[in-house]
Amino acid sequence: MYFEDFRVGQRFTAGPRVVTEEDLARFTALSGDDHPLHTSVEYARGTSFGEPVLQGSFGAAVAAGLWTRLGLVSASIVAATEESWTYHRPIKVGDELSLAVTIVRLQDSRGGGQGLVTRYNELRDGAGTVIQSGTATALVRAGDGGPRPVNRDVGTVAWGKALAEALTANPAFVSAVASWDGTIGLRGGEHEVHLRVYRGRIIDVTRRSPHGATFTFGAPDRIWADLLTAEESRFGARLMTGEFTSSGDPYEYLRLTKALEIIVDVARDLARTEHTEVAA
């Protein structure tokens, strides 16, 4: 697959792979981490784990290997650029590991011809419990597929403009902000776009408004990817569980709760279209 073949919300699975005694021995030798927690049965019995466990970085290595074996970017990958990883549970000999991947962010390179693909990874055991998780970003070559849809590029100016166009044509949104004067910030991961609203109209879409956002509403990329592609938005439940956060004026945020609900619904509709501007 080339850069333009990916879509935010795409999901892939790989595995399973059973962890062996040989894995533990080889990774210990390779990493140099020979702490008795990994090498001594007697020592490990006295810990909360009860038996030797694999080094934490073993999971990230397995996840990378399972992803590579899918062969999706074998002919297009340029380089890995970034990784963030969290350990939730220990990995032990005998565990059956599988990988669940969601594409959560696509970012065009300035020079064209390639782009950054960020995926959210969950390494799971045989029961489906998440053992480790995290994001990984890679630079991937583009093919000749033409412009890439930006309808799921939350927080970019191109996405914001497409969203603003759809909101302007939505009577419920226009009514919800008919008397409001302010700026709504929408953040996806590290990307944020500002919608300047004046009495029912969105009069500007920008990366940063001169006076900042009245309030900013946002979530990690993986939450937006799930929200935009799920069968149901479950917006209220997501707010209650803290998947989304807000900053800025709390009064204005609460005042525009209905407008935000409409924004989410319109964003989900937009995610099903094919806007192909170049993301900003």
Short names for language-model regions:
Residues 1, 82-87, 230-231:
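Short alpha-helix capping/helix-loop boundary micro-motifs
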Residues 1-82:
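Hot-dog-fold acyl-thioester-processing enzymes
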Residues 1-7, 91-150:
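HotDog/MaoC-like acyl-thioester-processing domains
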Residues 2-3, 50, 88-89, 235-236:
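Short, surface-exposed secondary-structure edge patches
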Residues 18-20, 102-108, 251:
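Short, charged beta-turn/beta-strand-edge "cap" motif at the junction between a beta-strand
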Residues 144-280:
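Feature captures hydrophobic
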